[in-house]
């Protein structure tokens, strides 16, 4: 303490850190206060809880005391911080976050910087201006940050301003549209050679945009540099009269038409398959599931044509090779035999008539030997009818055919196309009503070999 200077009132502030303990404020004269006696007093130690942080503020920079942390009654010394004379701040609100005008801290005194001529002048003071409205960052209020390219908000009632006709859209200035115009100039140029300076003038664009197009086209080998400012087209022909481009367009159109036709055929096949399924599964249609000879001949498309009827088991394989000269059909089946019939043309003289024995297909069953005997007994004469003997007009037919192979009616609707059996496969025999003369009535007995010849052989 300097001589001649009135001692100032000092303030000793003791606060409890960590939210524990209470603040103890003691004020005394600097000359008569013993700091060490105050910290060591029993009442002061009892008021502070363990872990309490003690800070003492004083105006005398030479005064050495301590800011201690009490741990189970132990006390350690530390440096002191000066306080502001003439102020008595509340211990509960000091060094806390300010909440408004009521919690403002008046003055906070800082210790003088060392080396200022012995500290003779008044200490430096700094005022904390936190404002009346609280935190300094909240004093201006919340503001939305402004975006650099954000458009101004438009009220819903304000009408949209239409663009003027002179303004160009983004597509008009795009590089793709410019490339199409550049290709049109190439197609109109002779021999596919184009001057880039002329192209820039015609298209009314900068020359660097033309270079952007030529660099890409040259990279994919569609053009090549003829000279400094001339390029030549290297792709397909661009003329409309002919060339590869017109041919490709024609082929694309043809493929589209064929695809539509194929789609139409697929729909027809599905429709026919569904109709056939409904016809075959219906019980009312099963009794009518047959085709007669008259039904086949009534088809106008089969008029004056040879009709072959194939009766084959299920899963029969039919192959028709692509041949221009002659038509061939290959049939193969592993489920059973295949029967092939020729459907002859219908004539006026020999019109088939349905009899009592004729089935619903128009076919007449083959008569047995008993039926032939009953028919022969009904006639007055004993001779065999000419109609039954007509196929036996020659000896060759007699030797190659038997009774079961002789057709009962030559006017039948179908003719069997199977090859006849060989002579060794026939067993000649006579019926019950036939005699030995029936075997030789059509033969010339003079031409028959003698019995001796049979004996010698």
Swiss-Prot record:
Subcellular localization? Nucleus
Name the chain's protein: Transcription factor E2F3
Q: Where is this region: Retinoblastoma protein binding?
A: 424-441
> DNA-binding region(s): which residue ranges?
147-237
| Start and end residues of each stretch annotated as Leucine-zipper | 196-217
Q: Where is this region: Dimerization?
A: 238-329
One term under GO cellular component: RNA polymerase II transcription regulator complex
Name the keywords, alphabetized: Activator, Cell cycle, DNA-binding, Nucleus, Transcription, Transcription regulation
Q: Which SMART domains match?
A: E2F_TDP (SM01372)
Q: What does this protein do?
A: Transcription activator that binds DNA cooperatively with DP proteins through the E2 recognition site, 5'-TTTC[CG]CGC-3' found in the promoter region of a number of genes whose products are involved in cell cycle regulation or in DNA replication. The DRTF1/E2F complex functions in the control of cell-cycle progression from G1 to S phase. E2F3 binds specifically to RB1 in a cell-cycle dependent manner. Inhibits adipogenesis, probably through the repression of CEBPA binding to its target gene promoters.
Query: According to its UniProt record, which protein family does this protein belong to?
Result: Belongs to the E2F/DP family.
List every stretch annotated Disordered. 80-171, 350-387
* Amino acid composition bias (Low complexity), ranges on this chain: 155-164
Compositional bias, Polar residues, is annotated for: 93-102, 371-387
């Amino acid at each position: 303490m300097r001589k001649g200077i009135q001692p100032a009132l000092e303030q000793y502030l003791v606060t409890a850190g960590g939210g524990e303990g209470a603040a103890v404020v003691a004020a005394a004269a600097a000359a008569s206060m013993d700091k060490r006696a105050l910290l060591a007093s029993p009442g002061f130690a009892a008021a502070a809880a363990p872990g309490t942080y003690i800070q003492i503020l004083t105006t005398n920079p030479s005064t050495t005391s301590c800011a201690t942390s009490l741990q189970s009654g132990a006390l350690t010394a530390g440096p002191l911080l000066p306080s502001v004379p003439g102020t008595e701040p509340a211990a509960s609100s000091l060094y806390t976050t300010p909440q408004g005008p009521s919690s403002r801290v008046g003055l906070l005194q800082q210790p003088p910087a060392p080396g200022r001529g012995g500290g003779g002048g008044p200490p430096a003071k700094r005022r904390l201006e936190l404002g009346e409205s609280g935190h300094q960052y909240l004093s201006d209020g919340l503001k939305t940050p402004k975006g650099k390219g954000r458009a101004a908000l438009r009220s819903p009632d304000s009408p949209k301003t239409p663009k003027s006709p002179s303004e160009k859209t983004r597509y008009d200035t795009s590089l793709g549209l410019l490339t199409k115009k550049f290709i049109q100039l190439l197609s109109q140029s002779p021999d596919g050679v184009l001057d880039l300076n002329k192209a820039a003038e015609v298209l009314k664009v900068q020359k660097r945009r033309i270079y952007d197009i030529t660099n890409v086209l040259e990279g994919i080998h569609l053009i090549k540099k003829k000279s400094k400012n001339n390029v030549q087209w290297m792709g397909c022909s661009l003329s409309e009269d002919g060339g590869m481009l017109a041919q490709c367009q024609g082929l694309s159109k043809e493929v589209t038409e064929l695809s539509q036709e194929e789609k139409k055929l697929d729909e027809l096949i599905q429709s026919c398959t569904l109709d056939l399924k409904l016809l075959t599964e219906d019980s009312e249609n099963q009794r009518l599931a047959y085709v007669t000879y008259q039904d086949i001949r009534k088809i106008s498309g089969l008029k004056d044509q040879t009709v072959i009827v194939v009766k084959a088991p299920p899963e029969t394989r039919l192959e028709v090779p692509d041949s221009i000269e002659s038509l061939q059909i290959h049939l193969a089946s592993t489920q059973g035999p295949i029967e092939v019939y020729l459907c002859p043309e219908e004539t006026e003289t020999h019109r088939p008539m349905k009899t009592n024995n004729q089935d619903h297909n128009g076919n007449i069953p083959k008569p047995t030997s008993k039926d032939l005997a009953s028919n022969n007994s009904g006639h007055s004469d004993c001779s065999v009818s000419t109609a039954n003997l007509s196929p036996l007009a020659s000896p060759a037919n007699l030797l190659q055919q038997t009774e079961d192979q002789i057709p009962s009616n030559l006017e039948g609707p179908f003719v069997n196309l199977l090859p006849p059996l060989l002579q060794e496969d026939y067993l000649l025999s006579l019926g019950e009503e036939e005699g030995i003369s029936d075997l030789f009535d059509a033969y010339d007995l003079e031409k028959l070999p003698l019995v001796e010849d049979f004996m010698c052989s």
